[in-house]
Protein backbone atom coordinates (compact mmCIF):
# COMPACT_ATOMS: atom_id res chain seq x y z
CA UNK A 1 0.00 0.00 0.00
CA UNK A 2 2.81 2.33 0.92
CA UNK A 3 4.52 1.63 -2.42
CA UNK A 4 1.31 2.54 -4.23
CA UNK A 5 1.21 5.97 -2.62
CA UNK A 6 4.88 6.58 -3.31
CA UNK A 7 4.41 5.67 -6.99
CA UNK A 8 1.31 7.85 -7.20
CA UNK A 9 3.10 10.85 -5.66
CA UNK A 10 6.15 10.27 -7.85
CA UNK A 11 3.98 10.11 -10.99
CA UNK A 12 2.12 13.29 -10.01
CA UNK A 13 5.40 15.06 -9.31
CA UNK A 14 6.94 14.03 -12.66
CA UNK A 15 3.90 15.11 -14.68
CA UNK A 16 3.61 18.41 -12.82
CA UNK A 17 7.28 19.35 -13.11
CA UNK A 18 8.04 22.42 -15.16
CA UNK A 19 9.65 22.39 -18.56
CA UNK A 20 12.79 24.40 -19.19
CA UNK A 21 11.76 25.09 -22.77
CA UNK A 22 9.76 28.31 -23.11
CA UNK A 23 8.02 29.88 -26.06
CA UNK A 24 9.35 33.40 -26.48
CA UNK A 25 6.59 35.92 -27.01
CA UNK A 26 8.08 39.35 -26.35
CA UNK A 27 11.24 39.15 -28.44
CA UNK A 28 11.49 39.99 -32.13
CA UNK A 29 14.27 39.39 -34.61
CA UNK A 30 14.66 41.08 -38.01
CA UNK A 31 13.54 37.79 -39.55
CA UNK A 32 10.12 37.84 -37.88
CA UNK A 33 9.66 41.62 -37.89
CA UNK A 34 8.71 43.85 -40.86
CA UNK A 35 5.69 41.66 -41.68
CA UNK A 36 3.02 44.36 -41.36
CA UNK A 37 2.74 48.05 -42.15
CA UNK A 38 2.50 48.80 -38.42
CA UNK A 39 5.80 47.04 -37.73
CA UNK A 40 7.48 48.86 -40.62
CA UNK A 41 6.07 52.18 -39.40
CA UNK A 42 7.43 51.40 -35.94
CA UNK A 43 10.90 50.83 -37.42
CA UNK A 44 10.78 54.22 -39.16
CA UNK A 45 9.53 55.86 -35.95
CA UNK A 46 12.67 54.58 -34.20
CA UNK A 47 14.76 56.52 -36.72
CA UNK A 48 13.54 59.77 -35.13
CA UNK A 49 14.68 58.84 -31.60
CA UNK A 50 18.32 60.05 -31.82
CA UNK A 51 17.13 63.53 -32.88
CA UNK A 52 15.99 64.29 -29.34
CA UNK A 53 19.56 63.71 -28.15
CA UNK A 54 21.06 65.86 -30.90
CA UNK A 55 18.87 68.94 -30.63
CA UNK A 56 19.66 70.01 -27.10
CA UNK A 57 21.70 72.81 -25.57
CA UNK A 58 24.73 70.73 -26.49
CA UNK A 59 24.26 71.48 -30.17
CA UNK A 60 24.13 75.20 -29.40
CA UNK A 61 27.36 74.99 -27.42
CA UNK A 62 29.07 72.80 -30.01
CA UNK A 63 28.14 75.14 -32.88
CA UNK A 64 27.97 78.68 -31.51
CA UNK A 65 29.76 78.30 -28.19
CA UNK A 66 33.14 77.78 -29.83
CA UNK A 67 32.90 80.87 -32.05
CA UNK A 68 33.06 84.62 -31.53
CA UNK A 69 29.26 84.77 -31.73
CA UNK A 70 28.73 83.49 -28.22
CA UNK A 71 30.55 83.43 -24.91
CA UNK A 72 29.52 80.88 -22.33
CA UNK A 73 30.56 81.68 -18.80
CA UNK A 74 31.74 78.74 -16.77
CA UNK A 75 32.41 78.55 -13.07
CA UNK A 76 35.67 76.66 -13.53
CA UNK A 77 36.96 77.36 -17.02
CA UNK A 78 36.24 79.10 -20.28
CA UNK A 79 33.63 76.91 -22.00
CA UNK A 80 35.30 77.53 -25.36
CA UNK A 81 38.36 75.69 -24.08
CA UNK A 82 36.21 72.80 -22.89
CA UNK A 83 35.89 71.38 -26.42
CA UNK A 84 39.04 69.91 -27.90
CA UNK A 85 40.24 66.71 -29.58
CA UNK A 86 41.41 65.42 -26.21
CA UNK A 87 38.08 66.25 -24.56
CA UNK A 88 35.41 66.27 -27.29
CA UNK A 89 32.44 66.44 -24.91
CA UNK A 90 29.51 67.64 -27.03
CA UNK A 91 31.24 66.68 -30.26
CA UNK A 92 31.26 63.09 -29.02
CA UNK A 93 27.47 63.24 -28.58
CA UNK A 94 27.05 64.51 -32.13
CA UNK A 95 29.14 61.60 -33.43
CA UNK A 96 27.46 58.95 -31.27
CA UNK A 97 23.84 59.98 -31.82
CA UNK A 98 24.44 60.89 -35.46
CA UNK A 99 25.71 57.41 -36.22
CA UNK A 100 23.04 55.84 -34.04
CA UNK A 101 20.48 57.54 -36.27
CA UNK A 102 22.29 56.25 -39.38
CA UNK A 103 22.28 52.73 -37.92
CA UNK A 104 18.53 52.85 -37.18
CA UNK A 105 17.80 54.18 -40.69
CA UNK A 106 19.94 51.53 -42.38
CA UNK A 107 18.17 48.81 -40.41
CA UNK A 108 14.75 50.22 -41.32
CA UNK A 109 15.59 50.60 -45.03
CA UNK A 110 16.89 47.02 -45.32
CA UNK A 111 14.01 45.51 -43.36
CA UNK A 112 11.25 47.43 -45.11
CA UNK A 113 12.69 46.83 -48.60
CA UNK A 114 12.28 43.09 -47.96
CA UNK A 115 8.85 43.44 -46.37
CA UNK A 116 5.71 41.90 -47.92
CA UNK A 117 3.60 45.04 -47.32
CA UNK A 118 1.89 47.04 -50.09
CA UNK A 119 4.40 48.49 -52.57
CA UNK A 120 3.21 52.09 -52.19
CA UNK A 121 3.49 51.93 -48.39
CA UNK A 122 6.86 50.20 -48.64
CA UNK A 123 8.28 52.84 -51.01
CA UNK A 124 6.97 55.67 -48.83
CA UNK A 125 8.44 54.26 -45.61
CA UNK A 126 11.79 53.47 -47.24
CA UNK A 127 11.92 57.00 -48.64
CA UNK A 128 11.19 58.48 -45.21
CA UNK A 129 14.01 56.45 -43.64
CA UNK A 130 16.39 57.50 -46.44
CA UNK A 131 15.52 61.18 -45.90
CA UNK A 132 16.31 60.82 -42.20
CA UNK A 133 19.56 58.99 -42.99
CA UNK A 134 20.57 61.81 -45.32
CA UNK A 135 19.78 64.33 -42.58
CA UNK A 136 21.98 62.49 -40.07
CA UNK A 137 24.84 62.36 -42.56
CA UNK A 138 24.33 66.06 -43.30
CA UNK A 139 24.76 66.83 -39.60
CA UNK A 140 27.81 64.57 -39.35
CA UNK A 141 29.52 66.12 -42.39
CA UNK A 142 28.66 69.62 -41.15
CA UNK A 143 30.33 68.92 -37.81
CA UNK A 144 33.22 66.69 -38.78
CA UNK A 145 33.77 67.10 -42.52
CA UNK A 146 34.97 63.75 -43.84
CA UNK A 147 33.22 60.84 -42.11
CA UNK A 148 32.87 57.07 -42.64
CA UNK A 149 29.92 56.45 -44.97
CA UNK A 150 27.91 53.23 -45.08
CA UNK A 151 24.36 52.19 -45.87
CA UNK A 152 24.54 48.54 -44.75
CA UNK A 153 22.40 47.10 -42.01
CA UNK A 154 24.83 46.15 -39.25
CA UNK A 155 23.04 42.90 -38.53
CA UNK A 156 25.96 40.59 -37.76
CA UNK A 157 29.55 40.68 -36.53
CA UNK A 158 30.99 40.35 -40.02
CA UNK A 159 29.25 43.51 -41.25
CA UNK A 160 30.02 45.31 -37.99
CA UNK A 161 33.71 44.45 -38.30
CA UNK A 162 33.81 45.74 -41.89
CA UNK A 163 31.94 48.96 -41.05
CA UNK A 164 34.14 49.60 -38.00
CA UNK A 165 37.22 49.65 -40.24
CA UNK A 166 35.84 52.00 -42.89
CA UNK A 167 38.04 55.01 -43.67
CA UNK A 168 36.63 58.51 -43.81
CA UNK A 169 34.92 59.45 -47.05
CA UNK A 170 35.12 63.06 -48.19
CA UNK A 171 32.17 65.23 -47.20
CA UNK A 172 31.64 66.15 -50.85
CA UNK A 173 31.48 62.50 -51.96
CA UNK A 174 29.17 61.68 -49.04
CA UNK A 175 26.77 64.48 -49.92
CA UNK A 176 26.84 63.54 -53.61
CA UNK A 177 25.85 59.97 -52.66
CA UNK A 178 23.09 61.33 -50.42
CA UNK A 179 21.70 63.55 -53.18
CA UNK A 180 21.51 60.56 -55.53
CA UNK A 181 19.79 58.57 -52.79
CA UNK A 182 17.28 61.37 -52.16
CA UNK A 183 16.54 61.81 -55.86
CA UNK A 184 15.50 58.16 -55.99
CA UNK A 185 12.88 58.93 -53.30
CA UNK A 186 11.21 61.88 -55.02
CA UNK A 187 8.15 60.04 -56.28
CA UNK A 188 7.54 58.14 -53.05
CA UNK A 189 6.95 61.07 -50.69
CA UNK A 190 4.12 63.62 -50.85
CA UNK A 191 5.03 67.09 -52.13
CA UNK A 192 3.48 68.94 -49.21
CA UNK A 193 4.77 70.79 -46.17
CA UNK A 194 5.69 68.61 -43.23
CA UNK A 195 3.01 70.30 -41.10
CA UNK A 196 0.38 69.10 -43.57
CA UNK A 197 1.63 65.49 -43.64
CA UNK A 198 0.08 62.92 -41.37
CA UNK A 199 1.93 62.97 -38.06
CA UNK A 200 4.30 65.74 -39.27
CA UNK A 201 6.47 63.09 -40.90
CA UNK A 202 9.38 63.64 -43.29
Question: PLM features: what roles do these ranges have?
Answer:
Residues 155-163:
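Short glycine/proline- and charge-enriched loop/turn segments
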Residues 31, 57-78, 150-152, 190-202:
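Short, surface-exposed recognition loops and adjoining beta-strand edges that mediate ligand/DNA contacts
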Residues 18-63, 97, 107-109, 172:
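Acidic, glycine-rich segments characteristic of secretory precursors and extracytoplasmic regions
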Residues 1-29:
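Bacterial Sec-dependent N-terminal signal peptides
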Residues 23, 63, 67-69, 146, ...:
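Acidic side chains
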Residues 151-156, 182:
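Short, small-residue-rich loop/turn micro-motifs
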Residues 23, 141-153:
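Short, well-structured active-site flanking segments
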Residues 37, 41, 49, 75-144, ...:
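Conserved, well-structured interaction surfaces
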Amino acid sequence: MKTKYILLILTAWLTASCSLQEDTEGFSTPGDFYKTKTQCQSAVNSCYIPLKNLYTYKMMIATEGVTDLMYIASGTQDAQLDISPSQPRFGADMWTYGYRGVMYCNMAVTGIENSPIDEKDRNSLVAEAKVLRAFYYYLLTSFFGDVPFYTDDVSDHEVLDRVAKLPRMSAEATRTALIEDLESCLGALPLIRTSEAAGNRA
